[in-house]
Amino acid sequence: MMRYKLVIAEKPSVAQSLAAVIGATARKDGYLEGNGWRVSWCVGHLAGLADADSYDPKYAKWRYDDLPILPEHWQMVVGKDKKKQFDILKKLMNAPDVTEVVNACDAGREGELIFRSVYELAGRQKPMKRLWISSMEDSAIREGFANLRPGVDYDGLRDAALCRAKADWLVGINATRLFSVLYHRTLNIGRVMSPTLALIVQREAEIDTFQPVPFYTVALELPGLTVSGERISDRASAEQLKEACQGAAVTIKKVECKEKSEKPPALYDLTTLQRDANRLLGFTAQQTLDYLQSLYEKKLCTYPRTDSRYLTGDMADSLPVLVNLVASAMPFRKGIAITCDPHTVINDKKVTDHHAVIPTRNLKDADLSALPAGEKAVLELVALRLMCAVAQPHIYSETVVIAACAGGEFTTKGKTVKHPGWKALEDAYRAKMKDAEPKKEGAEKALPELTEGQTLSVSAAIVKEGKSSPPQHFTEDTLLSAMETAGKENMPEDAERKGLGTPATRAGILEKLVSAGFLERKKSRKTVQLLPSHDAVSLITVLPEQLQSPLLTAEWEYRLGEIERGQLAPEEFLDGISAMLKDLVGTYQVIKGTEYLFTPPREVVGKCPRCGGEVAELQKGFFCQNDSCKFAIWKNNKWWAAKKKQPTKAVVSALLNDGRVRVTGLYSEKTGKTYDATVVLEDDGQYANFKLEFDQRKGGSR
């Protein structure tokens, strides 16, 4: 009997690429076969944790008395729409001619969980190996199959993935039900979603309460340069200094010139790539991940979901060839000499599961013009970063001038580039992008020759007024940065990063917040801001600290890493979350005075003709907000319905403010035709009535 090894990939397209390399080319029902291999696939998560009512039918209804729900024995179930593919995999795994199963799902936490869930439910009868690769290039696939690792080496990764899923289930099920029952509306709460939302709501509160502080600076125009003084808090003092300097002599106290060097940027991990793609290209984090995943499957980029910005030592020798190959494929670098110093990007200690995102050698034969625009743009960013990271430093001389006049001190800086280094590539890319992002401060600025003790005359003195700036609204770029550091904006480069979520999950978290109605993307000039909705602010107002604390959730993420490394027992992690939920259910009480928070703000459309109160639009019509007044214009008003019209916000606003409004397309029951007329509001104190007026000059056609 012929013996086979079964390979299970995460999706059909990856399975086909693997099968082509190992010679499994014969198509079967749900798998490929050949050369002693069978290759099949999952379709994302085939199985997941069971819903609450699977443990007890009473959990189908949301009741406070049933909380917290803490399963003692967890259940995994196959999705109804995934059963066919699961049955194929189960049959293949248990086939007598299959001797070994190879986990070829994505080499990361989620990929491990996707495979292990199916493997466990199928009975775990066959030995298991792990394919762990960072590139879909044929050579990388061959090397991976030649060095399959024991599946048990990744038990820690499986445990971390399963604990993450259980923690999300526990917090999501219990907190969502608790707050939904207490506040009488569905409030979706997530282990990572809620603290991420809290960051945004807190930022908006800081912006709303910000009070700008004016300041003044005195600038002196000298021959060939302008020098500026320090900030002054009151205009009178600034004007006094300006008058004292007008026409006076300035003495150059200090001229200091230093040669400085700016190191090349590190390679991309997923988060830094998503940030740059958002800032430079306007892509959302999810779009960037999707484009990069497609490039990975097309064998043009390495594994996307990485948190490393370095390469391993065994890649040093082949790196110069790759860099030159990449440079030849990028037209914007023409005329710029390409250099390669591998040591700037090699660091084995900073590579865990996967190295940084870089292009592959397949660029050499690829038709990049055939790529979708989004994928091509992301590929160019990745290529640019590789070329910059191994290029020479940017070297420049910086001159600092300090001058004195009328008892005040004034400064200016000059910059002269000695060797552009990696910035030549960046500048060429930006030129291609047609100023996609404004150039940062620090552009080249030459100063005239100056000597200490030299005196110059002031040709003009000017007072410039400014104001302190409020915090900026979050963009996906800046929010990803805040999530990565759990809100600590000044974390040292070498600090242990804990963060909200992982590079693989942050994009999905943002999309969930948008789809749930908690976040709105609002375009502002060249950026897209992330703004919290009314419900988002209300939710964070009532959530206790433990559910919105970025630091606590980041600590949980760190502990998942400890589980992955075998340094923490899964039970200890889950027991801590269960204890927190028990305490939450037992002690939380509805905050007094917050019942109104989850009532959407009502837009006022005009003044009430009866009492002068405010009339606002609600779901079924327009109503006076004065409780003692019954004025209303219903959207299903019979008078309007007979004319096949519904009173809109604009129409009602005009009726309330002007007493009349011109309406087109009114239907005549008598003629069956439409006509235009002026509708006049006549309120008799009990009902809102309407009448028509026609323009006699035009005959008022009906």
Label the predicted regions.
Residues M2-L6, K82, M93, T99, ...:
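Basic, low-complexity terminal or inter-domain segments flanking catalytic cores
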Residues P96, D138-L222, C257-S261:
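C-terminal or mid-to-C-terminal helical accessory/interaction module adjacent to the motor/catalytic core
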Residues A236-Y268, Q274:
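Metal- or metallocofactor-binding catalytic centers and their adjacent structured scaffolds
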Residues P12-A19, G36-V39, V43, G79-K90, ...:
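Amphipathic alpha-helical transducer elements in NTP-driven molecular machines
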